[in-house]
Each structure stands twice: as C-alpha cells, then as structure tokens.
Amino acid sequence: MRITLGNTLPPYPDFVEGIRRAPDRGYTLTPAQTITALKNALRYIPTEWHEQLAPELMEELRTRGRIYGYRFRPAGDLKAKPIDEYRGQCIEGKAFQVMIDNNLCFDIALYPCELVTYGETGQVCQNWMQYRLIKQYLEELTQEQTLVIESGHPLGLFRSRPDAPRVIITNSMMIGQFDNQHDWHIAAQMGVANYGQMTAGGWMYIGPQGIVHGTFNTLLNAGRLKLGIPQDQDLRGHLFVSSGLGGMSGAQPKAAEIAGAVSIIAEVDSSRIETRYRQGWVGHVTADIAEAYRMASQAMQRREPCSIAYHGNVVDLLEYAERERIPIELLSDQTSCHAVYEGGYCPVGLTFEERTRLLHESPEQFRHLVDISLHRHFEVIKKLVARGTYFFDYGNSFMKAIYDAGVKEISRNGVDEKDGFIWPSYVEDIMGPQLFDYGYGPFRWVCLSGKHEDLIKTDHAAMECIDVNRRGQDLDNYNWIRDAEKNQLVVGTQARILYQDAVGRMNIALRFNEMVRRGEVGPIMLGRDHHDVSGTDSPFRETSNIKDGSNVMADMAVQCFAGNCARGMSLVALHNGGGVGIGKAVNGGFGMVCDGSERVDEILRSAMLWDVMGGVARRSWARNPHAMETSEAFNGSHARDYQITMPYVADEELIKKIVPYIVGK
C-alpha cells in the first residue's frame, strides 16, 4: 500500500467570498532556490500531473510567497465532526483528524485557505498536499505505529508499540547558525519549514477560549498587584486598553468582561472585529476614538463590564488618550509582533488594506513604516506610564520588535536584550510568580463526541476536583469553571480551558478517563497550550521571570518533549519560535486521548505530573521562591517516586562583600 494524493486531479477551487486570505508573504528566492522549491512541491504529486500543475504552483509561489496547493484543499468548511464520523484503525488516528479540522474551520482559522490557524503565520502544515496525506496516514495508523511529521511533512508510519506516541511532530527546528527570520523565510518559501506557532502546528487549538482563562488571570492579578483590588473583588470600574482581535488576541475583550473590567481593544482588520462581534466576544464596535472613550467612561461610572472594539490603529488610540489626558490604568498589546514585518503589525497611518497592498508591492517601504510606527508606539506608552499607567508586554515580542527597530532605550541594561526590557512582560510580573511557579497552567480538553452535554458533565467533574480552600488561585479557577457555561466560551468543537497545577491536572484527567470507561461521556482529548510551566523556553515570555542566566537555555522545553514521548502521550510536538518568533523560543505540547482504558490511567499518572513538575523544578533551581516552596512540598508528598534537586540559597550580604572585592582587585 502506498499513501498518495489519489488518481483524480481535483478541480481548482472557488474561494468562498468573505473568508480572510493571507497576504503575499514575499517571493525572494534565487533562480536555483526557485527550481528546488518547485521540485519540492511536485514530489507530493503524481508525475502525470506535473506538466499541468508546475505553472500553477509556480504562480502561487510568485504571487503568494508560498506554495499552498490550493487545488488540493477539500471543498467547503472543514468543521470538526464527531469522532465516530471519521475513518481510522485506532481511536487516536480518528481523534487527531477532529483536532486538525477544528484548527482549519472557518469559525476558527485566521486564514483557512492558507492553513493558518492563528497568530498571522501559525500553520497546521505548509500545504494542502501535506494535509491530504496526513489525513490518509491517520486513517491507516494503528496502535503499533507512530506517524512522524516534520515541518508539516508526513515522513511516514513507523513501527512502535501501543504505549508509544501515535504522532510525533516537529516544526521549524532550524540549525543554530540559520535560526533567524531571514533564513527561515527562505526555508518556508522552499517548502521545508513550517511555522507551527504553538497549538496550530501542534493540532491543539480550541479557538480564542484557549487563551481567555490566562488573560482573565493576568488582568485580575494585574488589578490586585498594581491597582490594589482586594482578593475577593473584580475589575469593575477599571479600564484596560490593548490591541488585536485575532485568534489569540480576540480573547482580550471577553476575558476583560469576565473580570468585570471595561476594555477598549484596537483592531485594524474589520473582518476580525465582525467575527468577534458575531461570536459575542466583544460587545460594542466604533471607528470613533472619542466615542470609544466616552462609552468606556460611562460603563466605568456604572461599574458595569463593557468591551469595545475600536476599528483603527492602537497608536492613534493611545496618542488621543495622552493628548486628552484620559487615564488608562492597565495597558498591553497583542499585535503579532513575532511577524512584525510580515503583516503582524500594521503601521499607524495605513489602513489594513493599504498594509496588505504595500506588503506585496514594497516590503522595504513597509518595513520602514513599521519601524516609524514602533517608535511612536514606544513614545506614547512611555508618556502614559509616566502618568501612572501599568503597561505589560503580553508576550507577543512587542518590546523585542521595538528594540529591533532601533530603540535601545527600551532594553533594561541599555546594551542588549539579555536582561529584559524596561517594562515587564506579563509572565515576568504576574503569570510567572503567581501561576507558573506553583505549576498552574493552561490545561484543556476537547469532548471528541462533539456533544455539548459531554462538555457540561466534564465541567462539573473538573469543578469537583478543585479544593477552593488550598490557595487563592484554586478559588479563582473554581469560579472560572463554575461560570464557564454561562460565559459561552466555545468557538468550534466542544472544548474547555482551565488553569490547573500538576496534581489538579492529573486528578481531573483520571476522573475524565473513568467517566469514559463508565460510558458517561465519549472519548476526550487532553492537552494544553505550549505557553505553560514547562512547555516553552523563551526569555521574551515564558521564562522571563527566571533570573539565574538560564532564561536563554532551551533544555526545559526539549526535556519536557522527550519526557512526554517516553511516557507515552498520544501526540507530542516540539516547535521553534511559538508566540515570539523564530529563534526566540523553543516550545512543545502534547495531546492525550482518554479512551477509558487502564493503559491510559498509567500514562496519566506518570506523564501529567512530569509535564508540569519538570518546569517547576527548573524554576525552583533558578531560586524562584514559590517554585521552591512547591518543589519542597512535592518532594514530601511524592517521596516514593520523585526527588527534585533543591538549591542552597546564598546570603546576599556575603555576595555583596565578596564580588566587589574580587572585581576591584
């Protein structure tokens, strides 16, 4: 048997009107590289079609900057179906088809025709030939095999064993010398590199809900830490301003409303505003800055949650507030600055349509305008912060982009970015010490039956596993899952996000598998965002609160990936650059199918704890106080099977005496 694209050449598709399309990514290959790129694409395609398709694929490369193989895209909307409607030899093979189609459905994907799920450039795979082959391989996959995916390319099925992963994915794992945006762009054009973001290429995206709990936690804790809001109160009467209503950033208005705040979120793309408004993730829309702030002021006076989408550029929005002396309490940004020169950041003064056209016609001019806009963006934030605004980078490489645009003033040491920037990232100030250091992170699950009643049952089961008296974080998480149904978070298939620590995740996972075993619910996919305690190494986000010098090391993410492979997670993924861009992060994730078996129970008992505690242990070794407390307690409660190496903490006064003396000599 040979897996192929079949014997019938599909017709060229009619693109659905109103569905967003990715901009031209830029064609910059040499003639020799172009020849290789075309050969690379044609190797998926039977030779009898080459003469007809070679000019077509070449035109895609020339005009889109990528070869997508549009002809091979299945017609219509690729909505996730109930698992029983997919063909397969094993449950995992069918389950991952659910996840892939969910990543690419019109309600979820940013650019469905270009396989981009979210984050401007985050793809499931590179082209539709790969998609078709992956689907066929998943249909043939057995419990004795593992499917290997390398930057979207299905390398094939390889014999393994039932307690090994069914799918292993890597994306854009480039050699160090070439691990930069320029060389990656060449590799992507040539069809050998896929930017998987995090859960796009890791097949684990669940719509904007996937980040909304983390955003809710961030805003709530920012209010507690910086605005003095008591633990038992929310953000009523307080204003949050940011930008972006895309696949991840679109969580901001919903999270702010759930936290009780008033929010104004700037977005230049009207289609993204329309999507979030239609889905109920933003309450009001205006293109008038004065009206946006007026609506916000009225809602604050009434102490009512309110979300406002401003159709325009965030720089204009902030400069108006600075000029009119309108106080902004909490400020962030979620433009796609990991791809700042590829369209992820729209320069002030350009409409979204002008941005798209300029990207195609004059990428160098576009780059120049981005740099000018970033300078203005920096200057207005600096003025607002001086007046009392709390600004935090939301891990989108925003401050790194400003630094790269030539604003060295933004670096903390005035020399380079190794010590971070003058304003903290949300992980550095909030999520790191308050959540990651304890092991809390974005646990998630998908009810593969597609039944809403299964989701409600799992919500209640998860709620019963949380001890609200243990920590304040547990009470927040309990309230979150209690209100999840009321807050109407589902976009796409039936899924849920819930921040939990290591033991919490394991207990919930075991409870779910027991429910599947008893026939109370259908099979369940467990997973998490790569943006988690252990899953990602990045000094610009996930490990920005690690101060022992190891924030530039990627050992943790790689060990997490390898450990999850060894313990038998159903899917394991390792990527380059998730969230912050190529060369700036190494990130990984997993998927685990709960089929009700005792085999899965054993994997959950081992893998769920490892997946979290490996990161807590690393944070503890960096001398993060809460991680040290958590590791010490874990050593006591799990002494039979685990032992985390604990650091001895040096006396600060001793170090202050010794170092100046030696350096002075």
Task: Pin down the residues of each PLM region.
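General beta-strand structural signal in soluble alpha/beta enzymes
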Residues: 146-151, 169, 242, 265-266, ...
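N-terminal ligand-binding/catalytic initiation module
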Residues: 1-214, 220, 224-227, 231-232, ...
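Structural alpha-beta junctions
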Residues: 140-145, 260-261, 327-330, 383-390, ...
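Catalytic or ion-translocation cores adjacent to nucleophile or general acid/base/metal-coordination motifs
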Residues: 197-220, 224, 236-239, 245-303, ...
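C-terminal domain-closing interface element
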Residues: 295-304, 309-324, 328, 626-664
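Short, solvent-exposed amphipathic alpha-helical segments in soluble enzyme
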Residues: 257-259, 322-327, 407-411, 516, ...
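Core active-site phosphate/anionic-ligand binding loop and the adjoining beta-turn-alpha structural block
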Residues: 290-508
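Catalytic cofactor-binding cores of redox enzymes
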Residues: 101-113, 186, 192-199, 217, ...
